[in-house]
């Protein structure tokens, strides 16, 4: 079975002052603090969360 693709996501801006739903998306992606980097699976759900808070993130494939 082929390995699923992953996306590396880094939180580059603080969550202070953002909308609660945007903070929930960051938590859903596993991001806890500024400059925190995680690798998430390349699924439509994760891509939707990344798209919603793209102004806070740096994304690498």
UniProtKB/Swiss-Prot annotation:
It comes from the Bacteria. This is Large ribosomal subunit protein uL30. Gene3D superfamilies: Ribosomal protein L30, ferredoxin-like fold domain. Part of the 50S ribosomal subunit. GO terms for molecular function: structural constituent of ribosome. The gene is rpmD. Belongs to the universal ribosomal protein uL30 family. PANTHER family: LARGE RIBOSOMAL SUBUNIT PROTEIN UL30M, MITOCHONDRIAL RIBOSOMAL PROTEIN L30. Pfam families: Ribosomal_L30. Keywords: Ribonucleoprotein, Ribosomal protein. InterPro entries: Ribo_uL30_ferredoxin-like_sf, Ribosomal_uL30_bac-type, Ribosomal_uL30_ferredoxin-like. One of its GO terms (cellular component) is cytosolic large ribosomal subunit. GO terms for biological process: translation.
């Amino acid at each position: 079975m082929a390995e699923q693709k992953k996306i590396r996501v880094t939180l580059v801006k603080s969550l202070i002052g953002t909308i609660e739903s945007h903070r929930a998306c960051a938590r859903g992606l596993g991001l806890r603090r500024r400059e925190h980097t995680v690798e998430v699976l390349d699924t439509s759900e994760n891509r939707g969360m990344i798209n919603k808070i793209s102004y806070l993130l740096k994304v690498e494939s």
